[in-house]
Amino acid sequence: MKKITRRTMLAASAAFAVAPALAQPAKVMTLVVPFPPGGSTDALARLLQAHLQTKLGRTVLVENKSGAAGSLGAAQVAKSAPDGNTYLVTFDSHAVIPAILEKPQLDVEKDLVPVFLVGTAPYVIATNANRPFKTFADVIAASKAKPGSIQYASVGIGTLGHLAMTMLAKQAGVEITHVPYRGGGPAMNDVLGGHVDLIVGS
């Protein structure tokens, strides 16, 4: 899970308060999450929302804008008024947009400006407790026995989880089927429900 400390939250509220010189306290502040509710990025945004409302005395909303591996939400923020009232809460997804989209809706290097690092998180591979896999070696063995039969969920094509699993499968010489989702919440639900074997994410 993401590592968040009280000091981090205090610094974040200070950064949001002073970074945008044109911020208008009377207006609603919006934190755009480029994934559906229920995932780790959404959970982090809601922690940040509560803290910012308390510290800044402003109304702060979380808006989930999922799709296209996070690029739709990123594009919405890029096109918003530069008044310091709209922010993107994301992880690595925006960085791969130029590589996975032929005609991206934004230039991530020019249209977005980093404000603050709120947290960090490890990437893990997890499975339903009822599945026979106890180690990644078990996953590799099952994939070798029946190529393509093992499925893993990620939060979208081209995201870090997808790329990492693709590299791991290539190094192991196996075929593992990728099942992309719009976000970590729906992906985790299907893994817990036994519809997909594995999930890779934070």
Question: How should these model regions be labeled?
Answer:
Residues T5-L10:
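N-terminal export leaders
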Residues V18-P20:
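N-terminal signal peptide c-region/cleavage motif recognized by signal peptidases
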Residues K27-P36, L61, T86, S149-A153:
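Short, well-ordered beta-strand elements
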Residues L31-L44, A68, S154-L160:
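Extracytoplasmic "Venus flytrap"
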Residues G38, V77-A78, M165, V191-L192:
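Hydrophobic residues within well-ordered alpha-helices
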Residues G38-G57, H162-K170:
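Short, polar/charged alpha-helical segment
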Residues K79-N85, A99-P186:
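Hinge/capping helix and adjacent helix->loop/strand transition within the periplasmic-binding protein
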Residues G84-T90, D197-G201:
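Paired acidic/hydrophobic, glycine-rich loop segments that form the ligand-binding mouth/hinge
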